């Protein structure tokens, strides 16, 4: 969840407070927001951007905010016309871009798919959350989007660029492998909106023809065969090792003669000589941190 003030160009992160409800879980996003009500009342920012933490997107939030302010809408929801799962929320829009219908869990998805990014004034958010909590209402989708779409002006900002949800191991693997496609990389890592990462200038070393269509981080030593893989910093592939369709985290070592297919290793995993590890794109094999196999 983010808080953004266009006038002072600040972006600060708002984390949920303590968890509540049965089994230590919130009953909905509204209850989670209620837990940070004191923070919302104390901050100076005029506008709030609500986002989920499982979405991969390089979105020009400054454009979204300016568009929201210019429109005069009470809330702007970012959505896409690109297809997605039936379990998502879908909007129907009128000719002006106003949201006139909100549907969820539909058998045949129609309209614009909500990306769960919302822009609204801080004081309106406080008012909505306070009113919902007073009536034992905890769902942002049902009790705010659906119930108040007629009384308030909810508007859509349509984004048809790259947007991917990562909420399972399978989706993490699938979305990571999409980065091997140049068109996806160009869209996600747009030069006009750079993504900054920790610098490390140690070079990687390769045998001739050892790497095919792979993303290799700094400090890797590739002497075996690597194809359609993502290797994090400091990964070592020894001679005779054969790795394909894998995601290997920092410090992973694959010894001589080992064969890996569809594997995700956490940091500092060692795969011993001659081992064979086989996963699948629909069920990748995950090796825990620091394990030696």
Segments (PLM) and residue ranges:
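N-terminal hydrophobic targeting/anchoring segments and the immediately downstream early-domain regions
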Residues: 1-23, 38
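Pocket-edge structural micro-motifs
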Residues: 6-8, 12, 103-104, 158, ...
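Active-site metal-binding loops of divalent metal-dependent hydrolases
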Residues: 8, 53-55, 235
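Short capping/connector residues at structural and topological boundaries
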Residues: 15-19, 96-98, 282, 292
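Unchanged
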Residues: 22-178, 287
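Left-handed beta-helix
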Residues: 123, 131-293
């Amino acid at each position: 969840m983010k808080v953004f003030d266009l006038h002072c160009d600040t972006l600060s992160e708002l984390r949920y407070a303590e968890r509540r409800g049965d089994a230590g879980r919130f009953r909905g996003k509204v209850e989670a927001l209620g837990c940070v009500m004191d923070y919302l009342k104390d901050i100076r920012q005029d506008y709030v951007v609500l986002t989920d933490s499982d979405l991969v997107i390089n979105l020009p939030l400054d454009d979204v905010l300016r568009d929201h302010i210019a429109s005069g809408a009470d809330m702007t929801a970012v959505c896409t016309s690109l297809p997605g799962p039936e379990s998502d929320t879908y909007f129907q829009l009128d000719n002006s871009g106003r949201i006139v219908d909100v549907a969820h869990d539909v058998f045949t998805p129609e309209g614009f798919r909500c990306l769960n990014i919302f822009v609204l004034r801080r004081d309106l958010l406080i008012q909505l959350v306070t009113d919902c909590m007073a009536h034992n209402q905890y769902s942002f989708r049902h009790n705010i989007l659906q119930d108040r779409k007629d009384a308030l002006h909810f508007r859509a900002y349509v984004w048809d660029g790259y947007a991917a949800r990562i909420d399972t191991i399978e989706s993490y693997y699938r979305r990571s492998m999409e980065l091997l496609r140049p068109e996806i990389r160009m869209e996600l890592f747009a030069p006009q909106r750079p993504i900054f990462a920790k610098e490390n200038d140690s070079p990687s070393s390769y045998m001739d023809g050892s790497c095919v269509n792979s993303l290799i981080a700094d400090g890797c030593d590739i002497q075996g065969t690597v194809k359609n893989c993502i290797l994090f910093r400091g990964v070592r592939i020894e001679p005779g090792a054969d790795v394909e369709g894998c995601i290997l985290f920092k410090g992973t070592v694959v010894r001589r003669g080992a064969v890996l297919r569809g594997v995700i290793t956490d940091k500092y995993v060692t795969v011993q000589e001659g081992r064979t590890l086989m996963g699948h794109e629909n069920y990748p094999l995950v090796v825990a941190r620091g394990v030696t196999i």
